[in-house]
């Protein structure tokens, strides 16, 4: 299924309240790999881009060859040719508190480069890089 998957250790109701146009379907995934259960929330790409979630994200690109490793070691299902893991960093806890898995429906190289550039730009802007 194409789209963006956002994993957060929060109740989806909190995000739905913060982003009125946000709609989510969720289920718990791999609680044994984390100190707290993770909630998987499916959202479409425009909603992510319109939200403020990307302003605190840092990006890690994982190619398809790592899909088995991700499934076995981290418990995250793989949904396509590309995974982007992005999460706000906590100074006290170095783990990630959010994971975005992207399965693009547009041509891979151009769309991937564009998306990563947009997210990095928004991350830089959100951190006060242009101020």
Swiss-Prot record:
It is found in: Mitochondrion. This is Uncharacterized mitochondrial protein AtMg00050. It comes from Arabidopsis thaliana (Mouse-ear cress). GO terms for cellular component: mitochondrion. Its main location: mitochondrion. Keywords: Mitochondrion.
